[in-house]
Amino acid sequence: MTRAKPEDDEYWNSSKFKAFTFDDEDDEFSRLKESKRAVNSILVDDDDDEDDVEKVSWSGEPVGSISWSVRETASSIRSGSEQNFPKIDTAPSLSKQGSGYSLSSLFKAKSKPTAFQSFSESFSETSARTYAPELRKPKSDGKDFVSDLSPEETIRRMQKGRAFSMEKFRSLQDKLLLLDEAVSVYDGNVITAVLIYLKKSLSKEILFRELMPREVALRHYIHYLKEMGEQKLLVELLKALGRTEDMALMQYKEHLNIKDEGRRRDFLKSCLSLPFSQDDSTHVQDHYTLLERQIIIEASDKKADTDIFKKFPRKASILNMPIITTLYYSCFYHYGEPEGTFSSPSNIRKTFRISEKQYITTALGARAKLKSWFDVDSLFNTKNWLGYTKKRSPIAFHRVVDILQKNSAPVQVLQEYVNLIDDPELKLSVALKYKCHDIIINTYRDLKDRQQLIVYREKLERDSPEYRKIQELLNNGQIRWKN
């Protein structure tokens, strides 16, 4: 062969293409070694223009691209003799729990790497994250998964406020074990939480049956139903327990949820046949009778056009008011009506068995409010067998004076009732409190206490009738003073 021309040598030496030769040093192995040295020189050389260089793999694909990562990962799996990883399905499993990795994190490019990653680094970063088998957590950490806890462990976690689950307790036996364990720790919140779960997961018949021999749990369940206002279920429970009187009372309380007075009256009427105790039965009967009467009075007084309704207009309806409020209303607007009318105070007193003391106190307040002092006197006037009139009261007269004073009774009326107080010291105390001058002066005179008269005289205005009266007593030589 003829030697190449000098210009040909210059061409082959300067071009990136090399001429074909049969020399041993130009074989494929030599070219691979040269390429590796070239790559290593690039890794060592930290050129400032690195951002302008596109890094490619042996196949010409950009390093870090999705296709490159997939191909590199797949090739690493095929070389199983070196890595010895088990062969698994490469399809992603979306149903696995507890995995913090995602498909996007597999191909997430790093920002501005300072150097190429080696082949082993690329392999460990991709395949280990994606294809390594997911290891089970140690058994000691299994307690964090609450599905395998025993009743005792579940209750302890509930007490400590840690995560728990009662859904695994599906059989009746397991649920009762859970309830018994809750009762044994004497924690009301835990017992109530378990009862709520049993209420949701058991029929009421089975739940009622199992609660009967468990008195503590039963009391908590009854209290829970009361607090939640589940009256209907509570009535069924009490009936199943044979507690008929309690059941009747709970059913009676349903009237509080009825707003319409007519429907409430009818409901109360239906309650009369319930198995109440004797005292409770009387109470329910009175409640029904009172509401029935209030409806009649309310309908009549709405249309009333008498002077008292014009002078003192009603401020509220009488419906659903207590019996004493109804009596006060009757004494205020219907005082003096014949006993045969529903609105008569005497009729109400007789129908509902109101005591004399309660009746006098209520009527006194109503008539004193109207400044009807004649009616006030008539409440206390009684005749003896000789026909003489005398004031008598089932309540103490100092209480009568208090009620009269609150309703701005004149001094003459107050003094009349202060004089009826039997205890001299109490009489003097009440008289001083309400400035009943005549009673104070007469009391000091009866006690022959000259010094107290002098002291009290200084509290009065000069030339007032009371001042002159004290002066006359002090000048009276017939009185034997103690001091």
Swiss-Prot record:
GO terms for cellular component: cytoplasm; early endosome; late endosome; recycling endosome. InterPro entries: Spe-39 (IPR040057), Vps16_C (IPR006925). Transmembrane segments: none annotated. It holds the Pfam family Vps16_C. High levels detected in liver and small intestine of larvae at 5 days post-fertilization. Keywords: Cytoplasm, Cytoplasmic vesicle, Differentiation, Endosome, Protein transport, Spermatogenesis, Transcription, Transcription regulation, Transport. It is found in: Cytoplasm; Cytoplasmic vesicle; Early endosome; Recycling endosome. Interacts with vps33b. Belongs to the SPE39 family. Proposed to be involved in endosomal maturation implicating in part vps33b. In epithelial cells, the vps33b:vipas39 complex may play a role in the apical rab11a-dependent recycling pathway and in the maintenance of the apical-basolateral polarity. May play a role in lysosomal trafficking, probably via association with the core HOPS complex in a discrete population of endosomes; the functions seems to be independent of vps33b. May play a role in vesicular trafficking during spermatogenesis. May be involved in direct or indirect transcriptional regulation of E-cadherin. This is Spermatogenesis-defective protein 39 homolog. It comes from Danio rerio (Zebrafish).
